[in-house]
Regions:
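Acidic carboxylate-rich catalytic motifs and surrounding loops in phosphoryl-/glycosyl-chemistry enzymes
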Residues: 60-63, 229-243
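Hydrophobic, aromatic-enriched interface-forming segments
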Residues: 139-189
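Surface-exposed cleft-lining segments at the edges of enzyme active sites
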Residues: 118-145, 150, 201-208
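Histidine-centered active-site loop/cap adjacent to the catalytic His
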Residues: 242-272
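Short N-terminal or domain-adjacent regulatory/targeting segments
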Residues: 1-22
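Short catalytic/ligand-binding loop motif for oxyanion handling, primarily in non-cytosolic enzymes
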Residues: 35-38, 96-100, 171-181, 239-242
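Substrate-gating cap/lid alpha-helix
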Residues: 174-230
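Conserved SGNH/GDSL esterase-like catalytic core that processes O-acyl groups on lipids
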Residues: 23-27, 33-133
Length: 272
């Protein structure tokens, strides 16, 4: 089966299914890790290259936040009900955990702390001093809730479809922004931590790694509570700052490494 271009927008997807009715089908719904403009390097594109006999419906949007996620849900529900996907790949939560939303739950060491009800275990001093734990707990809950809505749609319309979620990776708070010509986004992390008095690079990495670990913990619990869900744990894949183009996006070889080392084993047997 020679599909050719297998990473498609909605307007081209029905014709591709008609031409290749036996091909596997996957929906990629998420953020800039699934649609990193203008680079041909993001996870969606890397995974499509690995599974050339699968038709991928491209629903990634750079900078997608919770409001944008919710706005897309009616269309996503129609797609799930119409196309009978073998797999749904979700990329969500990064902006809520170590992106723009970080400014909502950082604090100075002098400001009061409320730990909330999260199962934090041992909390690093840098985290206790500079993260509003109760507020972060709410951010985690909202990120999971957004994904849960897709799971509920799947349960209603296509119960055998397998849903995949992922952990991102440990970032380096470098202060590097995303740049495209005159357009700049970010940086997302270092300025927020600097502003609350956490300026030590090692301390900043302690905090951001802990945040990613807590997101992974919440995802693991979420996956364990739902049938036909799998967690792709990509933490620790990218070990150096040079593997990151900016604070929250890997370079091309970084996306490729995550796709090959983490996503390919998880998807093999479901996609082709």
């Amino acid at each position: 089966m020679n599909i050719g271009n297998n990473n498609l927008v909605l307007s081209k997807y029905p014709a591709a299914i008609e031409k290749h009715p036996d091909a596997r089908r996957a929906l990629c719904f998420g953020d800039s890790w699934f649609q990193y403009v203008p680079h041909p390097t993001d996870l969606n594109k890397q995974i499509a290259r690995l599974f050339k006999r699968t038709l991928f419906l491209r629903e990634g949007v750079a900078g997608r936040d919770s409001a944008m996620w919710k706005a897309a849900l009616p269309r996503i529900q129609r797609e799930i009900g119409t196309f009978g996907f073998d797999a749904i790949l979700l990329s969500n939560g990064g902006n809520d955990i170590v992106g723009e939303e970080l400014r909502e739950f950082v604090k100075t060491a002098a400001q009061p702390q409320s730990t909330g009800a999260g199962p934090w275990g041992e909390i690093p001093p840098e985290v206790f001093d500079h993260i509003r734990l109760e507020t972060f707990e709410h951010a985690l809950r909202y990120a999971i809730k957004d994904m849960k809505e897709v799971v509920q749609m799947r349960d209603l319309l296509s119960r055998d479809t397998i849903i995949y979620v992922h952990t991102y990776d440990y970032i380096f708070p470098s202060g590097k922004a995303f740049k495209l010509g005159p357009f700049t986004m970010g940086p997302w992390v270092k300025p927020f931590l600097d502003n609350v008095g956490l300026t030590d690079p090692k301390g900043q990495r302690v905090v951001t790694s802990w945040l990613v670990d807590q997101f992974a913990r919440a995802l693991r619990a979420f996956v364990s509570q739902n049938a036909n869900m799998r967690l792709v744990d990509s933490r620790g894949t990218l070990k150096t700052a040079s593997q990151w183009e900016n604070e929250i996006h890997p370079v091309a070889s970084g996306f490729e490494a995550i796709a090959k080392k983490c996503w390919k084993p998880a998807l093999t047997g479901v996609l082709e």
